[in-house]
Amino acid sequence: MSNTGTTGRIPLWLVGTVVGIAALTLLSVFFYGSYVGLGSSL
């Protein structure tokens, strides 16, 4: 397997997927907290 877009040893698509999932998780937690009322202090 030869990936053309590789940063060192980590493929770019893997980095993008992990970053995207982390961003969606943080956003969902923030919006859920603000909806419940816990995130209003943020």
Curated annotation (Swiss-Prot):
A single BP term in Gene Ontology: photosynthesis
GO cellular component, one term: chloroplast thylakoid membrane
Alphabetized Pfam families for the sequence: PsbJ
Family annotation (InterPro entries): PSII_PsbJ, PSII_PsbJ_sf
Listed Gene3D superfamilies: 6.10.250.2070
Oligomer and partners: PSII is composed of 1 copy each of membrane proteins PsbA, PsbB, PsbC, PsbD, PsbE, PsbF, PsbH, PsbI, PsbJ, PsbK, PsbL, PsbM, PsbT, PsbX, PsbY, PsbZ, Psb30/Ycf12, at least 3 peripheral proteins of the oxygen-evolving complex and a large number of cofactors. It forms dimeric complexes.
NCBIfam families: PRK02565.1
Name listed for the protein in its UniProt record: Photosystem II reaction center protein J
Gene: psbJ
